[in-house]
């Protein structure tokens, strides 16, 4: 029969399989696969940030060093970084110099050390017979003039246990020839001017050098070299001296010892004065 022979169409399981698989979501990627796929993008962004920062750093460092950017348009990355490191080191030295200059004890310590070194040079020149008299006079005059510049500046007063002595160069000696104090050009980086023209120069190794200006010689009888003596030392047969002491140093083929040229008022000369010289260290 036609009605019996007709059958209802049934869905084939094979035909329905693609439809069910198309509706299922994709499997999520693992963390390692995600990092691997995003690594080129992150690397590109990182390089872009580095190049942008180096470009800005190049502009800043050239402006800070006051260099023409057109002449340094092809600076390598290593050159930019080296210039930046050097500039930052110089800035750090300048800041340290400013901090030391603000400290009033710095000049006092330097003055005491300079005074002691000057005394040692004077003793050597007084006992050495092979030094020319003119050279000896010029050197001592130069040192005394440099010390006079330091004395004219503001500094901490020495303790009460120390009293100033003076050794005056006689006016009969020839006028000393100016011998400017020199500092290594490599160390002359951003000098800091102190009071009275005194300069504190930072060195490349992190230390500091004191630059003394060339003094202007006046028509005074002679430059005065202040020394220090311990007031606790008393001369035999006389009371303790509390006033400054003056002496004269003469120059000849054989100069007398500097200790013998300094004599306290109303006291003895010679070894007692040599023992009374104050040493800061």
UniProtKB/Swiss-Prot annotation:
One of its GO terms (biological process) is Notch signaling pathway. InterPro entries: bHLH_dom, HES_HEY, HLH_DNA-bd_sf, Orange_dom. Residues 110-143 form the Orange domain. Residues 9-22 have a biased composition (Low complexity). Residues 34-91 form the bHLH domain. GO terms for cellular component: nucleus. Residues 26-35 have a biased composition (Basic and acidic residues). It is found in: Nucleus. Residues 1-44, 262-281 are annotated as: Disordered. A motif (WRPW motif) lies at residues 278-281. It holds the Pfam family HLH. Keywords: Developmental protein, Differentiation, DNA-binding, Myogenesis, Neurogenesis, Notch signaling pathway, Nucleus, Repressor, Transcription, Transcription regulation. PANTHER family: BASIC HELIX-LOOP-HELIX TRANSCRIPTION FACTOR, HES-RELATED. Has a particular type of basic domain (presence of a helix-interrupting proline) that binds to the N-box (CACNAG), rather than the canonical E-box (CANNTG). Transcriptional repressor. Binds DNA on N-box motifs: 5'-CACNAG-3'. Promotes floor plate development and prechordal plate development. Required for lens development as early as the stage of lens field formation, partly through regulation of gene expression of the cell cycle inhibitor cdknx/p27(xic1). Required for formation of the neural crest downstream of multiple signaling pathways, and acts at the neural plate border via both DNA-binding dependent and independent mechanisms. Transcription repression requires formation of a complex with a corepressor protein of the Groucho/TLE family. Interacts with the bHLH protein hes6; this interaction may inhibit the transcriptional repressor activity. Binds DNA in the form of a heterodimer with the bHLH protein hey1/hrt1. Interacts (via Orange domain) with id3 (via HLH domain). This is Transcription factor HES-4.
